[in-house]
UniProtKB/Swiss-Prot annotation:
It is found in: Cytoplasm. GO terms for cellular component: cytoplasm. This is Ribosome-recycling factor. The keyword Membrane does not apply. The gene is frr. Responsible for the release of ribosomes from messenger RNA at the termination of protein biosynthesis. May increase the efficiency of translation by recycling ribosomes from one round of translation to another. Pfam families: RRF (PF01765). The keyword Cytoplasm applies.
Length: 182
């Protein structure tokens, strides 16, 4: 396994963690809150973004304008069934979601959720490290690499691991600050 591949896999873990953080509600309207919402549309689970134009007319409202008016009730149902805790307001052409300000208890809950997502990201990075180190050790046993090369590569892999775990920690600190800001 090449170091560039290891770094690429670790970067993808950080990006996945960032995407997961984007789905956490922070009290401000953000269209990425709806990224995980899928709608049962003509028998298939379809991402909401494929069925509607999503916008934020102001800092506390998300507007969803379906391309097909027949999907309005389906979209409303999907949002109600999601884990977002938001109540859709359907006026016949547009669905509006009012984002209420967060309570202190809800903020604490969201910080815990963010911490859990960050830990999952770190575990993913550590799994990449484990696989890379195992690969290097196998190459060492097979005689493809000297002991010094094995040790050097292991050190480089550990440095990459530390770098990307620090990135996840930075994202977590940023998200916690975002959640805690009233």
């Amino acid at each position: 396994m090449k170091l560039a591949d290891v770094e690429d896999h670790m970067q993808k873990s950080v990006e996945a963690t960032q995407r997961a953080f984007n789905t956490i509600r922070t009290g401000r309207a953000n269209t990425s809150l709806l990224d995980r919402v899928t709608v049962e549309y003509y028998g298939a689970e379809t991402p909401l973004r494929s069925l509607a134009n999503i916008s934020t007319p102001d800092s506390s409202t998300i507007a969803i304008q379906p391309f097909d008016r027949n999907s309005l009730n389906l979209i409303e149902k999907a949002i109600s069934m999601s884990d977002l805790g938001l109540t859709p307001n359907n006026d016949g052409t547009v669905i509006r979601l009012n984002i209420p300000p967060l309570t202190s208890d809800r903020r604490k809950e969201l910080v815990k959720t963010a911490s859990k997502l960050a830990e999952e990201g770190k575990v993913s990075i550590r799994n990449v490290r484990r696989d890379a180190v195992d690969s290097v050790k196998k190459q060492g046993k097979a005689g493809e690499l000297s002991e010094d090369e094995v040790k050097d590569l292991q050190d480089k892999i550990q440095k990459l691991t530390d770098k990307y775990i620090a990135k996840v920690d930075g994202l977590l600190a940023e998200k916690e600050k975002d959640i805690s800001t009233v």
